[in-house]
């Protein structure tokens, strides 16, 4: 017995709904186009107030001279700006203390909406956008945490480059 068009339509509708429900959200409120006035993809040569902190070849991390080490009334220990092949693609923010974590989490929820909570050691909240992903983490044992912004297009380029390096390296075996 063949299903009717109505039954097929219902089946297709249910399949579409189940796929949509199971897919992670790819947008969040106020997805940032940069951080503290620096747009994603900006060339490091355009930012004279940056000083090199860590050099990993194509990935380099900089500190900004005169950086404001506060977000709202939360105290920040350090903000590092990541560049891949000279282009701005990530921010790493380090902080200490549960009080700062609570303040920062509230600020990020206010700015970006409800987060996805990850089941990991400590607390981990994330926002996954079309072009940016953000993670706020806190380790209760170490009493410290970090926040990461990552510009996904340059992250994908970095992953492809790393994959090519691994393939080349595998030939040495």
Positions of PLM-derived features:
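A general beta-strand register signal
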Residues: 70, 83, 126-128
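Non-cytosolic coordination micro-motifs
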Residues: 3-5, 27-65, 92-173
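Bacterial N-terminal signal peptides
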Residues: 11-22
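Surface-exposed acidic loop/strand-edge motifs in secreted or periplasmic proteins
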Residues: 61-80, 92
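Bacterial N-terminal signal peptides that target proteins for export
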Residues: 2-12
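A short, structured loop/turn motif at beta-sheet edges
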Residues: 83-85, 113
């Amino acid at each position: 017995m063949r299903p009717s068009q109505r039954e097929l339509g219902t089946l297709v509708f249910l399949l579409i709904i189940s796929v949509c429900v199971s897919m992670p959200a790819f947008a969040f409120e106020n997805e940032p186009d940069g951080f503290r006035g620096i747009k994603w993809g900006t060339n490091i040569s355009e930012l004279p107030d940056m000083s090199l902190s860590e050099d990993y070849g194509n990935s380099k991390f900089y500190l900004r001279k005169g950086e404001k080490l506060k977000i709202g009334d939360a105290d920040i220990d350090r903000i590092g700006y990541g560049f891949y092949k000279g282009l701005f693609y990530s921010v790493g923010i380090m902080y200490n203390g549960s009080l700062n974590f609570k303040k920062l989490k509230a600020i990020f929820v206010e700015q970006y909406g409800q987060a996805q909570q990850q089941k990991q050691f400590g607390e981990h909240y994330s926002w996954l956008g079309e072009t940016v992903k953000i993670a706020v983490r806190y380790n209760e044992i170490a009493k410290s945490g970090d926040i990461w912004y990552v510009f996904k297009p340059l992250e994908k380029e970095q992953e492809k480059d790393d994959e090519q390096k691994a393939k080349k390296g595998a030939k040495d075996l």
